[in-house]
Every structure is written in C-alpha cells, then in structure tokens.
UniProtKB/Swiss-Prot annotation:
GO cellular component: cytoplasm
Organism from which the protein derives: Cavia porcellus (Guinea pig)
GO molecular function: 13-lipoxin reductase activity; 15-oxoprostaglandin 13-oxidase [NAD(P)+] activity; 2-alkenal reductase (NADPH) activity; leukotriene B4 12-hydroxy dehydrogenase activity
Catalysis performed (reactions): 13,14-dihydro-15-oxo-prostaglandin E1 + NADP(+) = 15-oxoprostaglandin E1 + NADPH + H(+); 13,14-dihydro-15-oxo-prostaglandin E2 + NAD(+) = 15-oxoprostaglandin E2 + NADH + H(+); 13,14-dihydro-15-oxo-prostaglandin F1alpha + NADP(+) = 15-oxoprostaglandin F1alpha + NADPH + H(+); 13,14-dihydro-15-oxo-PGF2alpha + NADP(+) = 15-oxoprostaglandin F2alpha + NADPH + H(+)
Modified residues (Phosphoserine): S20
Function: NAD(P)H-dependent oxidoreductase involved in metabolic inactivation of pro- and anti-inflammatory eicosanoids: prostaglandins (PG), leukotrienes (LT) and lipoxins (LX). Catalyzes with high efficiency the reduction of the 13,14 double bond of 15-oxoPGs, including 15-oxo-PGE1, 15-oxo-PGE2, 15-oxo-PGF1-alpha and 15-oxo-PGF2-alpha. Catalyzes with lower efficiency the oxidation of the hydroxyl group at C12 of LTB4 and its derivatives, converting them into biologically less active 12-oxo-LTB4 metabolites.
Name of this protein: Prostaglandin reductase 1
GO biological process: leukotriene B4 metabolic process; lipoxin A4 metabolic process; prostaglandin metabolic process
Modified residues (N6-acetyllysine): K178
Residues with Phosphothreonine modification: T18
Subunit structure and binding partners: Monomer or homodimer.
EC id: 1.3.1.48, 1.3.1.74
Subcellular localization, as worded in the UniProt entry: Cytoplasm
Residues recorded with modification N6-(2-hydroxyisobutyryl)lysine: K178
Length: 329
C-alpha cells in the first residue's frame, strides 16, 4: 500500500503564515479502481494566490496547489504509467486521480528544459504574464510598461514579453540582487522600491513621460502612487496584491477616482483561467519557443524536500524568491 504525505491547513492564517498553521499528515491510499491513476509528485508549486485562496479551505484540508507528477500506476488508458502530468493535487506526495483535470505537458517538451518550468515560465505564471500583458493591457510597440514584483515568477516574464513586443520596460523589486537580475534580462530601468527616498520620484526618473501600461502584482500604496504617473488612456492589469495579503490592520485607501476619471484609465482585474482551449495552447507554445530561442530567460528558486513546503511558501510571501518558487518532492 502506498502512503501519501500531505500538508494540511491546521488553522486559517492570521496575518503572516507561520509553520504552526500547517500540519503534516500521512494516509494510506486504497487500491486503484478502473479509470484511476496513482500520481507521485516530482515538483510542487508555491504561489501568492494561495494566501488568499486558503480562506476558502476548511481547516484540516490539504493545501491547494499545482504539481508536476509522474503516473506510477494506471488503470486509465489515457494516462499510462510513466506519463508526466500537471495536476491540481495540492501539497501531497501521492494522489489518486480519476483523470479529470489532469493535463499532459506539451508533446514536444524537450529533454533540455526542466519539467518544473511547467509550473512557471511555461505554465500558469507564464500564461498570466502573457494574457495580462497582451490581452488585458493590449500593449503595442513603442509603449512604456511598468511591472511591480518584477523579479517574481510572473513579473519577470511580463517584462521580457514586453521587450519582445518593442516596449520600454521599467521594473520595481525589493532587493539589489533582484534589480541586477532585471537589468540582466533586459529591463530598460529598474529600482529597489524599499530603498528609494520617494516612490513617486523613482517612477518619474525611470520614465518622465509616464506609463502606458502598469502590470500590478502588489496593490496597496504602490498602485495608488502609480495612478498619477499613468498616461491618458493608460491600462492597468490587476494580477495580484501581495503587499496587502498578510495585513491585519486597516488597508490603505483605494485608488484616486480623480486620476482614473481625468486620465480616462482602464483598470481590469483578471484570472488566467479565463483563457482556455486553442488560445491557451498557442500561448504555451509561444512561451516554449521564446525560452528555447533564448528570448525569455528564467530563474527558479528551488527548495529541496517536501517537508519544507510551508517554509518555501512563507519565504515566497516574504519576497525571498528570485523567479519562480518551486519545491522538489
């Protein structure tokens, strides 16, 4: 019998998550039924959305999340043993699936690319960058794009796609190491928002003429400050608000209606799962092509060991990761 280890939500987070909010449980899995497959996790993802999505979990439930898994036993002809799949199995080492919701990797996945990229640049974060920038912001060559949390899994891809499309790109991140990385991957300007004397002045210095598109990963005061720097008819794609996810005190005031009205801005929140079918498939192929051609570079922040899932999650929320945070099982 196979034993599965799972990290469960022991209690809902109060402010910043802590190790004591999680509990590691072990269960014995039953034999497979017809149509089922047994999955073994290879790589697991930790992402900012889990912080707010966890509010919908019942205490004691397995933490949600995506993983790259190997089919180790199968009674489902669509997923023979040895297949590599993407699964929404959560924080667990082994999982029995009926095959629904499993996704095979692109058939032409080359051996030289790590499978973990299916959780990052050629996966959900990459798709988020792709559709948020190209569909929500609808960027065109010659425009100026601002990205917050620019050295993260999503932001780093946003900036590189924007450069591919002929845009000027400005990134904000929270350490000098991250700023150096942004310049290495082609950002035109980047600044450490934690050390600048004035965020408003830093934004003006990076692009005196303002911004056509702002890809927002942080929300809060940063978003409010950016509004006055937007060009008329500018577009803002609201992807996340990691700066306020852990706050227990009163949230900062919302965006200024005056700036939105008189600049005639368009602000749109979005979830990547809006785009499915052929457009999603094309986006994945575009991302893989750009990675293989060296037009999109990637960096992974890898934590070894399933036992370290909570620590990896907490570190990611604290901004310790450069690029995509993944855990090896």
């Amino acid at each position: 019998m196979v034993k599965a280890k799972s990290w469960t939500l022991k209690k809902h987070f109060q402010g910043k998550p802590t190790q004591s909010d999680f509990e590691l449980k072990t269960v014995e899995l039953p034999p497979l039924k017809n149509g089922e497959v047994l999955l073994e996790a290879l790589f697991l993802s930790v992402d900012p959305y889990m912080r707010i999505a966890s509010k919908r979990l019942k205490e004691g439930a397995v933490m949600m999340g995506q993983q790259v898994a190997r089919v180790v036993e199968s009674k489902n002809s669509a997923f023979p043993a040895g297949s590599i799949v993407l699964a929404q199995s959560g924080w667990t080492t082994h999982f029995i699936s009926d095959g629904k919701g499993l996704e095979k990797l692109l058939t032409e996945w080359p051996d030289k690319l790590p499978l973990s990229l299916a959780l990052g640049t050629i996966g959900m974060p990459g798709l988020t960058a792709y559709f948020g920038l190209l569909e929500v912001c609808g960027v065109k060559g010659g425009e100026t794009v601002l990205v917050s949390a620019a050295a993260g899994a999503v932001g780093s891809v946003v900036g590189q796609i924007a450069k591919l499309k002929g845009c000027k790109v400005v990134g904000a991140a929270g350490s000098d190491e991250k700023i150096a990385y942004l310049k290495q991957i082609g950002f035109d300007a980047a600044f450490n928002y934690k050390t600048v004397n004035s965020l408003e002045e830093a934004l003006k210095k990076a692009s005196p003429d303002g911004y056509d598109c702002y890809f927002d990963n942080v929300g809060g005061e940063f978003l409010n400050t950016v509004l006055s720097q937007m060009k008329d008819f500018g577009k803002i794609a609201i992807c996340g608000a990691i700066s306020v996810y852990n706050r227990m005190d009163q949230l900062p005031p919302g965006p200024s209606p005056e700036s939105i009205i008189y600049k005639q801005l368009r602000i749109e929140g979005f979830i990547v799962y809006r785009w499915q079918g052929d457009v999603r498939e094309k986006a994945l192929r575009d991302l893989m092509k750009w990675v293989l051609e060296g037009k999109i570079q990637y960096h992974e922040h890898v934590t070894k060991g399933f036992e370290n899932m909570p620590a990896a999650f907490i570190e990611m929320l604290n901004g310790a990761n450069l690029g995509k945070a993944v855990v090896t099982a």
